[in-house]
Amino acid sequence: LSLTSFDKEFELNGLAAESWLQSDDGLTWTFNLRDDLKWSDGETLKASDYIFALQRAATTGYDFGWYWSFAGGLKNWGPVTDGSMDVDQLGIKAVDDKTIEVTTETVKPYLPSVVSLWYPVPEHAWKKHGDEYAANVETMVASGPFMLESWEKSTNKMVLVKNPNYNAP
């Protein structure tokens, strides 16, 4: 469940984020998450799940890294991804369970559209199953309107069902 999304008229709307504000200097954005966001396993979706996702992307050779450097302009993305700076110095933080703060290197007035491609990773599932958390039906956890019911890997057939814990727009 991304923070924002575009509707059929190409208007930007909140998805996981119910609101966002840009600081006076233009370098810091605060995103406020909707109440009662849940993973498909019933666990609460937290701001820290978004932070965990980008921290993993920054430290695991993520192929889409240029997006967060160029379009997103995240503070310290380059030094963190090249290993010369600790991932905790990346310009993202969970202020609390419902608040994400993003700091950029330069003013990015379009950042709310950039975060339409920022998806969380269920840190609780990853801690329990490692990278296998998304490798099979029994351990896969989703945040969107659907979840995996079955997966025939030999034929690449997946059956999706409604996620009963999905309550975003």
Annotate the PLM regions.
Residues 1-24, 55, 141:
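N-terminal lobe/hinge region of extracytoplasmic solute-binding protein
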Residues 15-17, 24-28, 87, 95-99, ...:
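Extracytoplasmic
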Residues 17, 47, 51-55, 89, ...:
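Extracytoplasmic/secreted envelope proteins and their assembly/folding machinery
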Residues 29-32, 159-161:
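Structural recognition of the beta-strand scaffold that forms the well-ordered cores
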Residues 32, 49-51, 58-125, 152:
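Surface-exposed binding/hinge segments that line
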Residues 37:
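Short basic (Lys/Arg) and small-residue
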Residues 104-169:
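Gly/Pro-rich hinge or "lid" segments in bacterial periplasmic/extracellular proteins
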